[in-house]
């Protein structure tokens, strides 16, 4: 590991040096940096692909699945809690709207802070603390039904969920082999609607009239038990090697993380060991660098340049000062990544992800809010309605799992097709001139597919050093829009009627469909952290 650290530090220490003149400094610096990045990334990808899907990946998968299952159940529990507090205190519509939104507000705040939090402490510690606090909040939910207490409790719970949503997912996502990354990442998202569906079904069969408080406490047992299991499993999680290498530039700790993962897998084979000195991997990385034009096709060219660079360091005080500034910049780089999202490479995708995430989130939760308004025409039983509504999110998740790795469609074309089809369904509904439950269901069905794949696609586009920030900010805009969606839809519903909501959906869906055409990079089957480099 010490050799690994020295290997890459040696490459980084020559970034500001050039013996031939000022005009070539930036070009050579960029080539050395790209060569270093491609080489290191190739080592990581070879190691992960050789590992396959191991016991450690299963631990990550089950932890993520249980968390999303719990989060889904908490959505239904929130509905029961609102009904119960309203029954006890006869709340106004303002108070109901406030409490309905407070959890989403906590979630939104935490998505803004999650990158800052992971700069201060390890991901593992952030996950453990958030799981433990959410466990306390779930337990305390049993004891009191006071409006203020319940609001604070739901805010804290939403705050923890916002952190866990990003970090648990990324720990799994960044460790997956390339071939199954999209399939597994999309499969995980299935467990949120499954949690909603399972608890809604349980409520339908088990809840008794006139015993709402007893029923509520009984239902809280399920997320409480599952959260206890998540807390135990989180103890065995390791830091993401990719985050350590690229996000924090801690190369020795990254290699140590690979070692601990192999120990957890009880794997003694050489193929899964992270070995910087593997000549085959080194040669493959060099071939990639030559193909990209990062380095010339000369075996000793880079070694000669390194010797010349190091000789210049000893004789040039300005170069030494430049290296010190570079080291200082690396230390503050972790706190200034927002600018990277708006760099030339990522600007288009950052803006598109924010627009697509916020608009589709607004529409999705608007449909979620509107469905209960049309469902009573079919069935008056609340939880049976919820069973039907939540079941609509399950089939499109299976479609997303199949389509995301399809050679003909891939990520970007599936997102495009999903938004275009959803827009067409909205136009048909407008043409018919009335709100039909079937079309609302189809709208929710078709929108779920691009929304889920967009989550995976954005994670693949961003490099590791800005992935947490990029994904959390997209989630922030999505959650903020979903927070205001019920208020806006309630106003539209009251003032203009049910059908008017579709007049709001159509233009937003048109923007999403048009915007998705500018997603030019296909990420299927491609290694992380080199997608943007290869498409420059």
Report each predicted region and the residues it spans.
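Transmembrane-helix signature of 12-pass secondary carriers
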Residues: 2-21, 26-259, 291-296, 319-536
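Long, low-complexity inter-transmembrane loops of multi-pass membrane transporters
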Residues: 17, 27, 260-334
